[in-house]
From Swiss-Prot:
Residues 1-44 are annotated as: Disordered. HAMAP family: Ribosomal_bL34. This is Large ribosomal subunit protein bL34. One of its GO terms (biological process) is translation. NCBIfam families: rpmH_bact. It comes from the Bacteria. InterPro entries: Ribosomal_bL34, Ribosomal_bL34_CS.
Length: 44
């Protein structure tokens, strides 16, 4: 049996990346919340 997590940079960025967050209103809310919390890293 293989491990379930097979990391790929492209697919991760497509779902969790900065540009994908900016492309939707809810994604922008996520970024705003992370800025308000003071996260050093906003997105993947």
């Amino acid at each position: 049996m293989k491990m379930t997590f097979q990391p790929k940079k492209r697919s991760r960025a497509k779902v969790h990346g900065f540009r994908s967050r900016m492309s939707t209103s809810n994604g922008r809310k996520v970024l705003a919340a992370r800025r308000a919390k003071g996260r050093h890293k906003l997105s993947a």
